């Protein structure tokens, strides 16, 4: 299970997740498609998925407890990426409304999002360091760094990095 902050009792999260319906996807099945709206959150029980955006893999997820579809659920919008299974995978399934109804699950998802923001911030710092170290001044890289800075600063977060989900 991903790191659960000390303010959430581990057993409380596990108990709530264990009550959610279980679904299984076979290898190479689409779990979410970008542009669709499912109103569901999936919590990986076992297996592996790839997350792709515009045909580019942005993550492989294998850690039990990882949450998928949380951005769509929290922002009440369509999924922003494609999620596809790499092997037979099991998920606990929750309606998006669970985030409004269950503060423990909401805090769990918030902690996961905070970890991901922390990772993205670290990636930006690393990229900026590489750009400065190698005196890379290409417009594309510069624009990418600037865009990441804008996105992250809009959250009010400090730029730090740590391993995550």
Question: What do these predicted regions represent?
Answer:
Residues 21-36, 61-64:
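Conserved short histidine dyad/triad with adjacent acidic residue
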Residues 56, 123-126:
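Structured alpha-helical
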Residues 18, 59-118:
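Cyclic-nucleotide recognition modules
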Residues 133-165:
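Phosphate-/nucleic-acid-contacting segments
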Residues 39-55, 64-66:
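Glycine- and acidic-residue-biased ligand/ion/polar-headgroup-sensing regions
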Residues 30, 48-52, 90-91:
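Short beta-strand segments in beta-sandwich/barrel cores
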Residues 117, 124, 131-134, 138:
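Heptad-repeat positions
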Residues 1-29:
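Cyclic nucleotide-binding regulatory module and flanking cytosolic helices
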């Amino acid at each position: 299970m991903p790191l659960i902050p000390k303010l959430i009792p581990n057993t409380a999260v596990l108990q709530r997740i264990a009550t959610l319906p279980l679904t299984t996807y076979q290898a190479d099945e689409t779990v979410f498609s970008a542009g669709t709206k499912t109103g569901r959150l999936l919590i990986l029980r076992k297996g592996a998925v790839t997350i792709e955006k515009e045909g580019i893999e942005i993550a492989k997820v294998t850690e039990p407890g990882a949450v998928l579809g949380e951005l769509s659920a929290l922002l009440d919008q369509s999924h922003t990426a494609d999620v596809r299974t790499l092997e037979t995978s099991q998920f606990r399934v929750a309606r998006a409304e669970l985030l409004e109804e269950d503060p423990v699950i909401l805090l769990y998802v918030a902690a996961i999002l905070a970890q991901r923001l922390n990772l993205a911030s670290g990636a930006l710092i690393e990229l900026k360091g590489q750009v400065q170290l190698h005196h890379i001044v290409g417009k594309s890289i510069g624009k990418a760094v600037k865009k990441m800075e804008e996105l992250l600063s809009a959250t009010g977060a400090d730029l730090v990095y740590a391993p995550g989900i």
